[in-house]
């Protein structure tokens, strides 16, 4: 299986030579949110300009940016002497009146590319991504900093189509040695107004709607159950008070009856002695 850097390089190929290449969007493996409102991440032209033979001397790659138009595909980035243009973001109104140089970076030989096996290492991830990718529009302060020097890689405009071109420059001579084609139009994202965002739950799944309905009605049922429990407790308290009063009345009515029985018993007991005296008296008469 070929190394991953080779696959990335092949992703930029169109016909097989540097002149017939086009800059391509970075793979979603390395740039998930791409393009954004103001930036576009591109794959660097790795192993393209030096694919046939090693280059001698020091070389840099210039990245030019141009707003898409009817003539942008044939726009030139060099003068009649093969000297690369030095137009800036401000001079071209952000690429609307002509191409501007946004980024310049050293051409890394294929043999010196960092291994992608260490992409999982947090301390090395940024270095590896910088070696394989370039982000257009990444500098948000260069336009307003009066002390800024160098290329101003200013933010791009939202909802705008751009074209990009890589140019190989020999730093010893300062001349263009090779270049790619202009890329296909790449459109930056558009900011979605909040008023147009559809928050209606009708776009949710049926299961989500059922769960939302149940959770929404659950507090109501809990409140009804709580109120019912309070009402039942009050009814039970009233019933227990009525039974206590009834028992006390029965007890009070039962007391006189018991007393009456005692009186009758007492009376019967008191009648006992006279009977005994009569028996004694009759016995005396018999004697």
Swiss-Prot record:
Consequence the record notes for mutating residue 273 to L: Found in patients with renal adysplasia; uncertain significance; normal targeting to the cell surface
Keyword Transmembrane listed: yes
Recorded topology in the membrane: Single-pass type I membrane protein
Cytoplasmic membrane side: 236-287
CDD domains: UP_IIIa
Region (Disordered): 242-287
Protein name (record): Uroplakin-3a
Species, as recorded: Homo sapiens
